[in-house]
Amino acid sequence: MNPPQARVSEQTKDLLSVMVNQHPEEDAKVCKSSDNSPLYNTMVMLSYGGDTDLLLSSACTRTSTVNRSAFTQHSVFYIISTVLIQPICCIFFFFYYKATRCMLLFTAGLLLTILHHFRLIIMLLCVYRNIRSDLLPLSTSQQLLLGIIVVTRTMLFCITAYYTLFIDTRVFFLITGHLQSEVIFPDSVSKILPVSWGPSPAVLLVMAAVIYAMDCLVDTVSFIGPRVWVRVMLKTSISF
């Protein structure tokens, strides 16, 4: 049952008016005004509980759909990156390997993609274990470990891509036409639909390398950026 509506005495109104208004000349006007009665009644109700008590437990409150947690754009991008972007880039790296027998970028992309999934598994296990133990989702040491994995993955791929695109001359000769390559389509596709043309494996390699590098950079910034901002601006750390 809801508690009865409290009647506020004149002395209580005078006391509350001092709390609300710091100017003594306006206190009398505020106390005599009937428009402020709902405000006074609400403040008194808050002092001992009731339907408007701000200290109610979460079990007794109703959270609107606007304030409920939901998938963010980063969550959707992370899923698309893990399921689509990285595997497709690795396929293009494999096409370049089949055309030139240069397996450096293909090996690096494959291993770093596996490392990305390994990091995801570690994060899920840490969150599950901490929540089961009634702790915060991620401790400081766990966030540090995940951050090292993210930064290392980005640095290794950027170094490998830089060597393949700018130091190894095969990509340049393939793009300019000085070095011919085989058709990159698999034999199974060629048997069903004979194909004698296709995009250059070097062009696909450049596109895939740029997309994969951007994916790594976005992943690093989205993981490191919020934590650095909270540490610098709020002098604290986040636990997820």
Curated annotation (Swiss-Prot):
Interacts with gK (via N-terminus); this interaction plays a role in the coordinate transport of UL20 and gK to the trans-Golgi network (TGN), and is required for their cell surface expression. Interacts with gB. Interacts with host STING1; this interaction inhibits host interferon-beta promoter activation. Pfam families: Herpes_UL20. One of its GO terms (cellular component) is host cell plasma membrane. It comes from Varicella-zoster virus (strain Dumas). The chain crosses the membrane at residues 76-96, 104-124, 147-167, 203-225. The gene is 39. Belongs to the alphaherpesvirinae UL20 family. Keywords: Host cell membrane, Host endosome, Host Golgi apparatus, Host membrane, Host nucleus, Membrane, Transmembrane, Transmembrane helix, Virion. Its main location: virion. GO terms for biological process: viral life cycle. It is found in: Virion; Host cell membrane; Host endosome membrane; Host Golgi apparatus membrane. InterPro entries: Herpes_UL20. It comes from the Viruses. This is Protein UL20 homolog. It is a multi-pass membrane protein. Plays an essential role in egress of virus particles from the nucleus, cytoplasmic envelopment and virus-induced cell fusion. Forms a functional protein complex with gK and this interaction is absolutely essential for their coordinate intracellular transport, gK glycosylation, expression on host cell surface, and function. Together, they modulate gB-mediated virus-induced cell fusion and virion egress and therefore actively participate in these processes. In addition, plays a role in inhibiting the type I interferon responses by suppressing STING1-mediated activation of the IFN-beta promoter. Coiled coil: none annotated.
